[in-house]
Amino acid sequence: MKKILIMLLAGIMMLTSGCLAVGSADNGGNKKVANRIAVIQTNKGTIEIELFEDKTPITTKNFIDLAQKGFYDGIIFHRVIDGFMIQGGDPTGLGTGGPGYTIEDEFRDDLTFDGEGILAMANTGMPHTGGSQFFITLAKTPWLNNHHTIFGKVVKGMDVVRDIGHTQVGFQDRPVHDVVMEKVTIKEAE
């Protein structure tokens, strides 16, 4: 009887440890994928932005696809408001253009305009009207929460963003001297 009890307990322990091992392997297989980095080379310096592929996949895929096609290369930051944001991504340079399509909004409670360096999709003020235009904040802007999809954050070159923010502007907040995105590339996370 004692042998049967010991064998039964040993069997239960083996089954339990086997189940735990499977659970651990499963949990270990769900590793967080590192987000890629957008590198925006401007005539004022370079900005690096972590793209939130894990949280806003539609918007980041759209941005990455456009960047990899060279869509942003040579486009200006057409709207600059010191203390608020810098905006670019319009192929016409007038603030009215885009890629010829729009994408869905991806608002998240865990992504907020809580400081400078937030990358978000510009829109017309109506739902699901983002396309290629984006902006980077120069300050905390909580009134924009749930109105613009946040899809990244500056990780290097915030001094360049601030410098662009101090650019002299004219009519419709357009820089007097063009601030050009010379090249926009995507690199793997470090």
Please report, for each region that a protein language model flagged, where it lies by residue.
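Cyclophilin-like peptidyl-prolyl cis-trans isomerases
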Residues: 4-190
